[in-house]
Amino acid sequence: MADKADQSSYLIKFISTAPVAATIWLTITAGILIEFNRFFPDLLFHPLP
């Protein structure tokens, strides 16, 4: 059985891979945009003058 140091090393290596990092990044970005649009619905997209 692997010890705690190996398990945390594998977890950090897994989280830092590109697909996982991109998924986390896009989820956070989408959440920020959704919440911004919920509080300020008219400010996200400006119509052309």
From Swiss-Prot:
The cyanobacterial PSI reaction center is composed of one copy each of PsaA,B,C,D,E,F,I,J,K,L,M and X, and forms dimeric and tetrameric complexes. It comes from the Bacteria. The chain crosses the membrane at residues 14-34. It is a single-pass membrane protein. Pfam families: PSI_PsaJ (PF01701). NCBIfam families: PRK02733.1. InterPro entries: PSI_PsaJ, PSI_PsaJ_sf. GO terms for biological process: photosynthesis. Keywords: Membrane, Photosynthesis, Photosystem I, Thylakoid, Transmembrane, Transmembrane helix. Signal peptide: none annotated. One of its GO terms (cellular component) is photosystem I. Belongs to the PsaJ family. This is Photosystem I reaction center subunit IX. It comes from Nostoc sp. (strain PCC 7120 / SAG 25.82 / UTEX 2576).
